[in-house]
């Protein structure tokens, strides 16, 4: 007799039939083994996931981030930020010029379309609501300027003056890379903008490049500072990247970039040797 898995499968010997039964048993064993391996791999992958303590993760201390943009001639879209510290059941009341314009708290999103056709200035305020009561926890405001453009926010910028290289070639400036960060700790993002000269290029090309400038602006266009990387930092995508983040967790974002002798910080201080010139 032949037994497989303690089951009697034959009392007479037939070579072809017995071969078929044995092959079937092997196939079943392969299936069981494959299932076992798959189960082990899934369990291992789950155990490999880090166990985060989200209470200890560094977070930016951000405000409500209210912004109002004219959607069309008769509508203004108001948007704001839902914070990680907000209760899950938080709703929001929206006010225009001190008058509530939402019939009930907005709880299905963080934006609201206001029917407002006047070209005049309008101040919007967003107040969080929990269990039917305004908490006044991190209310946010934004003033829509008069005759605001449709579809975007207009931010005035201080374009640098044209420059001239030692070879006598004139260059101009244009906005290039940008990032965001709360540099002053007020809970709202500022814009960090790089001005790139028109003659920027990498070391595969000879010749001079203009000085790279980096500005910081509020959304209303107020310029907080300007950094000049100086003549010893070549202008080009390979050399003038920068990073913005609150690296030391003091509530204010830092900016990290390459500098050299002659670079000027946002307060007008010159770094290193003011007379050094490494371009030759």
Mark where each language-model region is.
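Boundary at the C-terminal end of the N-terminal hydrophobic targeting segment
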Residues: 46-50
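Beta-propeller-forming repeat regions
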Residues: 59-61, 73-75, 82, 87, ...
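Bacterial N-terminal signal peptides
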Residues: 35-44
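Short, positively charged and aromatic/hydrophobic N-terminal segments
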Residues: 4, 8, 12, 17-21, ...
């Amino acid at each position: 007799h032949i037994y497989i898995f303690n089951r009697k499968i034959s009392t007479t010997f037939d070579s072809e039939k017995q071969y078929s039964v044995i092959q079937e048993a092997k196939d079943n064993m392969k299936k069981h083994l494959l299932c076992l391996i798959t189960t082990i791999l899934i369990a291992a992958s789950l155990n490999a996931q880090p166990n985060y303590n989200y209470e200890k993760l560094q977070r930016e201390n951000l405000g409500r981030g209210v912004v109002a943009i004219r959607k069309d001639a008769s509508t203004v879209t108001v948007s704001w930020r839902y914070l990680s510290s907000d209760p899950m059941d938080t709703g929001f009341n929206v006010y225009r010029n001190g008058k509530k314009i939402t019939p009930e708290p907005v709880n299905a999103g963080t934006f609201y379309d206001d029917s407002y056709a006047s070209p005049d200035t309008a101040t919007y305020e967003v107040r969080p609501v929990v269990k039917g009561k305004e908490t006044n926890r991190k209310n946010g405001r934004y003033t829509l300027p008069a005759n605001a453009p449709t579809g975007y926010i207009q931010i005035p910028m201080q374009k640098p003056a044209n420059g001239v290289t030692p070879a006598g070639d004139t260059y101009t400036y244009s906005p290039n890379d940008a990032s965001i960060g709360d540099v002053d700790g007020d809970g709202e993002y500022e814009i960090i903008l790089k001005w790139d000269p028109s003659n920027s290029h990498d070391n595969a090309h000879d010749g001079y490049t203009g000085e790279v400038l980096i500005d910081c602006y509020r959304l209303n266009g107020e310029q907080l500072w300007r950094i000049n990387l100086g003549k010893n930092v070549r202008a080009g995508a390979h050399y003038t990247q920068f990073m913005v983040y609150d690296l030391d967790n003091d509530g204010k974002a830092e900016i990290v970039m390459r500098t050299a002798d002659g670079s000027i910080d946002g307060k007008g201080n010159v770094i290193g040797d003011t007379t050094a010139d490494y371009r030759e």
